[in-house]
Amino acid sequence: DTLSELALDMRSTWNHATDQMWRQLDPVLWDLTQNPWVVLQSVSRDQLQSVLAESAFRENLDALVQARRDLAEAPAWFQRAYPQSPLGCIAYFSMEYMLSEALPIYSGGLGNVAGDQLKAASDLGVPVIGVGLLYQQGYFRQLIDQDGAQQALYPYNDPGQLPITPLRTESGEWLRLEIALPGYSVWLRAWQVQVGRVKLYLLDSNDAANYPAHRGITSELYGGGPELRLKQELILGIGGWRLLAALGIAPEVCHLNEGHAAFAVLERARRFMADSGQGFEVALAVTRAGNLFTTHTAVAAGFDRFAPALIEQYLGGYAEQRLGIPCRDLLALGRLDPNDASEPFNMAYLAIRGSGAVNGVSQLHARVSRHLFAPLFARWPTPEVPVGHITNGVHMPTWDSAPADALWTKACGQERWTGNTDTLA
């Protein structure tokens, strides 16, 4: 159990105190995978008993487990700096997370930012909960064949070899959600990833209760056509918020990492409607104050757009039966011109209209974004379009080796990362 506790905590991806222990269990497999859970699942009973019989190994294991538990209970920066903070939970929604090669549910920069944000939140003690999707194949792996052509490979992500655990109810059942799509329901399984102090919840449609075609909805990251992408974003946004509700979690803040998860603002408003008896317009106005949208895109073509007919097909019933509004009002939230029936539904527009704050990922990007979104704010001077900026960073313990950290600490001091970007120039 203690080995499992360590193997299933992604903190090992930036705190490498356990590396030598996994290497001792199976040096070849560890060097190939860097996946503690695979090593623990694959090691023979004889080998495991042999290393556990060594007093030095046992002492190191006990010390590592105790250190992990002490860290989880000790107040971190957030608790020390804001001991009376009313902020209980921030729900962070992202289409991808880059935490480790052992959990390949990412493509590139967006996942990099999301993964590092969770790791930094763990170190700082910020009360963040991540919400995402578990992909059976993830993003494709590139292979260049003998003719110089690219081949796309989709290796299968076996959940039994990933550092994740099924999310269970108090009665021990696997937590599953039912999402209604046109003409059928999709069952979603819920998983948990431990990222130090932070939890990441993942949903996937590969449930035996689903038809084969529907089991593959969460198969590929950024794969398939617009209809598949829409289904994934419905699962992420609407399914993700329902998952939090099923867990009894009521976040004060909903952070949308790009527009993929913008449907969460609709489900959050629907939940408020059910609790308060208010209509959709009031519910959206109230809940948007607690929603934050981070845009990463620098060109308008990068925003997800869906044909009006597709939105009507998949969200028409949801709008009328759950939100109490005609579908045209829902479509208007994702359009520049609400009266243009041919205009596609823009997820970034929905995210902006459903969020109380919007930010780009650098000062320059915020300036570009203000130009991109200026048409939504008629008669506003472009410099005053309400898009701020928070400069993207990285989680240094993940990317900085111990020798490099020692060198930079000697040259620039231990507090070199605590200033603003001007001090880093």
Q: What feature does the model see in each segment?
A:
Residues D1-A425:
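Catalytic cores of carbohydrate-active enzymes across secretory and cytosolic contexts
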